[in-house]
Amino acid sequence: MGVFTYETEFTSVIPPPRLFKAFILDADNLIPKIAPQAVKCAEIVEGDGGVGTIKKITFGEGSQFGSVTHKIDGIDKENFVYSYSLVEGDALSDKIEKISYETKLVASSDGGSVIKSTSNYHTKGDVEIKEEHVKAGKEKASHLFKLVEDYLLANPNEYC
């Protein structure tokens, strides 16, 4: 099994505490509300929403995938770090065993946030992950992030 790591960085004018509440802690409610074409719904299959919780994410009709299941590996509300692993679903091919993600929000000097995301693709055998595959996923994540940021800017009293 090989592991391929990719890192991404975004910036936002939204401070980490507010962005973490919306983009991480309440994503299961907010994203289907503002981007139903991307995510139809999210439901807890097992657990209480904390570490170890298993969630099923059903994608919207505009997605190339039907659903995925992920397991929450870590939530650090004080340092704004969230990690989870994609463990099941049609986004995983016969070449990928799982994908682990870590998102960390860091305060920027202008009062906003720097969002640092690390993706670890755990492959079956000696398979290599093509950059195009990763780039497409990064673009979708960037688009969802921008929608959340726009929502927070338009609704300054939410997630305070």
UniProtKB/Swiss-Prot annotation:
One of its GO terms (biological process) is abscisic acid-activated signaling pathway. PANTHER family: OS08G0374000 PROTEIN-RELATED, STRESS-INDUCED PROTEIN SAM22. Coiled coil: none annotated. Belongs to the BetVI family. Keywords: Allergen, Hydrolase, Nuclease, Pathogenesis-related protein, Plant defense. One of its GO terms (molecular function) is abscisic acid binding. Possesses ribonuclease activity in vitro. This is Major strawberry allergen Fra a 1.06. The gene is Fra a 1.06. The keyword Nuclease applies. Its EC number is 3.1.27.-. Highly expressed in roots. Expressed a low levels in ripe red fruits. It is an enzyme of class 3 (hydrolase). Gene3D superfamilies: 3.30.530.20. Signal peptide: none annotated. It holds the Pfam family Bet_v_1. InterPro entries: Bet_v_I/MLP, Bet_v_I_allergen, Plant_def-hormone_signal, START-like_dom_sf. GO terms for cellular component: cytoplasm; nucleus. It comes from the Eukaryota. It comes from Fragaria ananassa (Strawberry).
